[in-house]
Amino acid sequence: MTHPVWIWQYEQWPHFCWNDSNIISLLARVRQQQGQLLGLMSSLGFDTQSHNTLEVMTEDVLRNAEIEGMMLNPDHVRSSVARHLGLDCAGMPEADHYTEGVVQVLMDAVQHADAPLTEERLFNWHAALFPTGRSGITAITVAAWRQGAEPMQVVSGAIGKEQVHYEAPPSERLPQEMAQFLRWINSEESIDPVLKAAIAHLWFVNIHPFDDGNGRLTRTITDMLLARADGSSQRFYSMSAAILRNKKGYYEILEYIGKHGMDITPWLIWFLETIEDAITTAQTRVQRVVQKTLFWQKHISTPLNERQVKIINRLWDGLDGKLNTSKWAKMTHTSSATALRDIQDLVQKGILRDSGEGGRNTNYVLHEHKSCPRCGAAFICQHENPAKCQCAGVKLSPATRAHLAAQYPNQCLCRKCLLEFSI
């Protein structure tokens, strides 16, 4: 017998194997981080939760498409997601028909994550991605498995110099392949739900059952299974955004596994590390939302003009570039003198401070009151200036610092909590 070239040609297909000892600690860490994020979200108010869900699901739709080189209109996506979440859509543009269909796919996947994944459900998702029956100008089979004797190949390169990265099972095998896949998806196995999401991702993308849209539907199935794993119909982190940040690595690991037999340990490690990245990014964003909420609660009675409120909100939401007098004047359409008075007023009120960078122009940053990720207390942190940060005066052992850095990545604890670990 000829040695198998592609993973589905192995006799053991689709009975994947992996080395538990290589993934067990990583999986435990991911599950802990999931719990921390869900706990943090549950402590927030309904409006804050809803806003965060809107932003995450909007990003997920945009990045899932962007991985395939498709750029959707962010305002249309946000409008459609908001409507499906039952949020206020006043002032938002109405989403076009195509965007509405794409959003419906993700909504169905995560809001009905516990519903069985069936052939009909997959066909409905596929039809929503290709409402005209075409991929670009090419007619494709829609809402049905791909057909014909032509091999389904993933290729790159110029015409005549194509490189074949993967070849999927022939179309005559698809009914059997997909029936087996769907039985497994809907079965009550003892496997960890996060590992199930990883395996489903790899399995479906290797079957490649449709003429087009396989990557987007693969990641939709992943979102569905991660929603099951989280026990939540809301998404608080975006796997597609994390994949896009390492798109090259994503395609490299899929190509490697597609050619190297049934041991999928490298894929599971990559998948779990990518979830870690997604959750860490989400934790940072949520902490920012919490900090912004605490800030406005503290300054509810502080007299501020419209220009100051506008710029403060922009700083909390992530201002591009540095804030100085000239940028303030440009953003608020006012004079440099007025901009300087606005800034000096905020400095006196303890809202802005000199960034300490020096140079010809003074740059300003928020004098932030952060919330401790361990106890929730508000405190001032200047982590970008370690000499002035609360962390600086507390002596911690290297092992303790490593432990805290792993448990609370890119975050400071308040001084009270740090002192509990001091030596």
Language-model features: locations:
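Short linker/helix segments within small regulatory modules
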Residues: 396-409
